[in-house]
Design a protein with these regions (language model features):
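Hydrophobic alpha-helical membrane-insertion segments
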Residues: 20-24, 55, 80
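Amphipathic alpha-helical dimerization/coiled-coil segments
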Residues: 2, 72-99
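Beta-hairpin "wing" of winged helix-turn-helix
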Residues: 52-61, 68
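Generic marker of residues within folded, mature protein domains
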Residues: 8, 57-59, 81
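Generic detection of intrinsically disordered/low-complexity segments and helix-coil linkers/edges
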Residues: 35, 40, 61, 82-85
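N-terminal helix-turn-helix DNA-binding core of bacterial DNA-binding proteins
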Residues: 2-39, 48, 64-74
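Generic hydrophobic, helix-prone segments enriched in Leu/Val/Ile
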Residues: 27, 53, 91-93
Length: 99
C-alpha cells in the first residue's frame, strides 16, 4: 500500500469514523449516513476518496454498493481492539466510534 495517499485519506475525522464502522461490517452509503448522522452526499465523497486511496473495497449487491475495509488492512490486537495496519503505520480505531 502506498502510505501517502492513505494517510491523506485518513486525515479527516469522519473518514476515521467510517473506517471504524466498516471494520466489522459491510454497509451501503445510506446505512453509513444514518449511523454517523452525516449527509449521503458527504459520505459518498468520503467513500470515493477512501476507495481511491486503497482503504476500502466495494461489492455490488443488487442496486446497492457495499463498502468494507480492504483485505489485509484489518488486524485485531488484544481484546477486540480494532487496528488498521497500512504497513508504514498503524491506527487504533477504537477511539473513533460513531457519534
Amino acid at each position: 500500500m502506498d502510505c501517502i495517499p492513505a494517510l491523506k485519506a485518513l486525515g479527516e475525522e469522519t473518514r476515521l469514523r467510517i473506517m471504524r464502522l466498516l471494520f466489522d461490517d459491510q454497509l451501503n452509503v445510506t446505512q453509513i449516513s444514518e449511523r454517523l448522522h452525516v449527509s449521503i452526499y458527504n459520505i459518498s465523497k468520503h467513500l470515493r476518496i477512501m476507495t481511491e486511496a486503497g482503504l476500502l473495497e466495494t461489492e455490488k449487491s443488487g442496486k446497492q454498493r457495499l463498502y468494507r475495509v480492504a483485505d489485509g488492512l484489518k488486524h485485531q490486537m488484544g481484546r477486540d481492539l480494532p487496528v488498521l495496519d497500512l504497513g508504514c503505520c498503524t491506527f487504533r480505531l477504537d477511539r473513533f466510534l460513531p457519534k
